[in-house]
């Protein structure tokens, strides 16, 4: 019956969770069409691979699709969803399509509020180094592939599992990684208890012969572990973790020692900075050891790791100012990114441009956002990236700036749009600065435009 489906339409095809699935489907020989609100490099890439993509959503985009896949951000009143249901065409979430792809392979899924993309990418790098030729689907651009997906011929499918709407429960992996369990996506979940319940169900969804590799350092993970009835391998810096890391040296590269059940395994070098990325590496090491990949192969892969797009990505330097871009948009991610910035560039003044992501997240975590920028010398705020959400009265980039000023000494400036922020940059940035653009929306454009502008302008 699977052969009856040949034409697949994807609404929001350019999104981080959708584009990788689309690329794998194209490589498998399916006819893929889709729509997205705007043109992007990702949309252009998918078009070059054979996808037929419309810019904007409309009833006419659907064509004669056999199934419609929608991203988390797409609502039930989307015209393409409406016409599909009128015609009796199945409309499924992206996780259900990912689950179908996973049925064809041995699945490994990486979940967690933060660190999913990097951990998934590290696993992909290790499995590729080991000659396993995995299929990989991530929510970012793995620099080694130049894309967020890769169709391999091997046994394993390694994928990022999206907890944002609970649809990661569609997946049936043989092994999982959970990096952390934190308060986020409160537009979908009623509270932290509901988030805990979803992660417990996810961990208990693996078979009895599988394994869950989980970060014991995270309080949320530690909180739910007593409710998990499947095999567990804990990792972290804690002396209670079975797979334990100890940082030896940190900087542009991270050097750390690894031990398992008290036995020293050796030293690793990760071609990526940050304490949080050592934790991500430990999660990937845990799964790799469970599969049977030799320690030497793991070490070689970590040393070669080329990184992930928009994860503390050095974009360039102009007039003595180093520009780094990062996807971080949750307070915990922001703190980790700024700590990394301080560790890698300790002598530089830290100027941060932040675009909040979603009105619901900004409202729910307002207090945490007010205190997470304390490591910055200067903070430039712009308006909230809505991600299809309607505005919430009293919640804005400007109100966030007011809140930050009340509780920290960080210098804060608010700009209603990118144009205003970019116009102010020449008077703010000076030689020796580190300029970090932060956010899940389009704030990266500010750094890109600064680097592209005339030198010294």
From Swiss-Prot:
Keyword terms: ATP-binding, Cell cycle, Cell division, Cell shape, Cell wall biogenesis/degradation, Cytoplasm, Ligase, Nucleotide-binding, Peptidoglycan synthesis
Subcellular location: Cytoplasm
One Gene Ontology CC term in the entry: cytoplasm
Binding-site list for ATP: 112-118
NCBIfam families: murC (TIGR01082)
Family: Belongs to the MurCDEF family.
Protein name: UDP-N-acetylmuramate--L-alanine ligase
Organism the protein comes from: Solidesulfovibrio magneticus (strain ATCC 700980 / DSM 13731 / RS-1)
